[in-house]
Amino acid sequence: KLGLTSEYFAELEYSKPDILSAMERMVPRIPLDAARWEGEMFEIANTFSDAGVTSKFHEGAADIMSLANKTPIARETRETVDETRSLNDVLDMYVNAIKK
């Protein structure tokens, strides 16, 4: 959305290739469990808040799970997920979900 994807990926490829590789494997699969994880992030946020620790990190994570759940991937399953999607393809789906 901000036009920084290729520059960011180039930096990761140079400085943190293992992280980029992990992102390529994991980010496309996040929507498969996002609905469940959204609730879990709110539960953790509430626990942290009750303990007097900031809940904002996990509230933000819940927001990301909500966004992931709006992508078409969220309607797939572990058995039917399209494994050929690139990280860029998936990020485009996230951007489109923001627009909704």
Predicted regions and their residues:
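Helical "substrate-binding/catalytic lid" subdomain
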Residues: 1-83
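Short, basic/aromatic-enriched C-terminal tail that caps enzymatic domains
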Residues: 80-100
